[in-house]
Amino acid sequence: MQVLVRDNNVDQALRALKKKMQREGIFREMKMRGYYEKPSEKRAREKAEAIRRTRKLARKRAQREGIVSNGRTASVR
């Protein structure tokens, strides 16, 4: 991964690098590879993540179509 340093502004380059790494999922990957994960545990985790993603997508679709409220309650006075 490559980031340009402009005008010797290393802090800005580091922020850009961190943002790129976050988007690519490198931090999450490093965390996951920090210890051995059994293949059966990996399958179970991936299946749970897929279910979570599907539910989140369905919830967003329902909100967009107006079927379900967004979960916030309006205060009545």
Curated annotation (Swiss-Prot):
Basic and acidic residues compositional bias, start-end: 38-52
Lineage: superkingdom: Bacteria
Composition skew (Basic residues), residue ranges: 53-62
PROSITE patterns: RIBOSOMAL_S21
Keyword match Ribosomal protein: yes
Annotated region described as Disordered, given as residue ranges: 38-77
InterPro entries, alphabetized: Ribosomal_bS21, Ribosomal_bS21_CS, Ribosomal_bS21_sf
Keywords: Ribonucleoprotein, Ribosomal protein
GO cellular component: ribonucleoprotein complex; ribosome
GO molecular function list: structural constituent of ribosome
Matching PANTHER family: MITOCHONDRIAL 28S RIBOSOMAL PROTEIN S21, SMALL RIBOSOMAL SUBUNIT PROTEIN BS21M
HAMAP family for the chain: Ribosomal_bS21
Entry similarity comment: Belongs to the bacterial ribosomal protein bS21 family.
Protein name, UniProt field: Small ribosomal subunit protein bS21
Provenance organism: Bartonella bacilliformis (strain ATCC 35685 / KC583 / Herrer 020/F12,63)
